[in-house]
Amino acid sequence: MMLELLSDREIRDITAWLRSLPAVSNPGLKKTWLSDDIKKQLRDGSYPYDDDQPTPGVDPPDVPPADPVALGKHLAYTSCTECHGRDLNGWGPDDPTPSLIVAKAYTPTHFSRLMKTGIAANGRETKTGFMSGVARWRFSVLTDAEIDALKRYLDSR
């Protein structure tokens, strides 16, 4: 679900960035395990997706939304659903991720610190440390405006 919601501009920006990287040689890299039949089905839209998988064809916006709450929603559904579930209410039986309603317990300052450094509202790493690592690795590159937009959306739910 995350990638299918990226805007056309975001896809173009990512593609341009990937093309700007120097080529690498990796003769040990295995070719894709996808058969020619599966590749054809993916291209023509006939691949039988599992019931619990997102359905292709969601129309993403042409550009990321300008309104802060709408931008926050866009960021949440393109960045947070991987771990917190498609509805952002958490998931996972063994080591469940929390519902993002927990964001309401954070002040804007504490939320920004979590996103940039991985330090939770209590001044320590998150309970399992997983979100702390993800924040430092993935979310620390968000701008202050993006973090504010994400917080606004999560608070509005």
Q: Where are the regions a protein language model picked out?
A:
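Gly/Gly-Pro-rich "capping" loops immediately C-terminal to redox-active cysteine motifs
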Residues: 1-7, 34-43, 85-113, 130-143
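An amphipathic alpha-helix signature
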Residues: 8, 12-15, 19, 108-112, ...
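The canonical Cys-X-X-Cys-His
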Residues: 14, 72, 78-87, 111, ...
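Protein kinase-like catalytic domain
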Residues: 19-22, 84, 116-119
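Ligand-binding pocket scaffold of soluble enzyme catalytic domains
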Residues: 21, 126, 142, 146, ...
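Extended, well-folded interaction surfaces typified by the phenylalanyl-tRNA synthetase beta subunit core
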Residues: 26-36
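Electrostatic cytochrome c docking/interface patches
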Residues: 40-76
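Accessory, usually C-terminal, subdomains that scaffold auxiliary metal cofactors
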Residues: 118-133
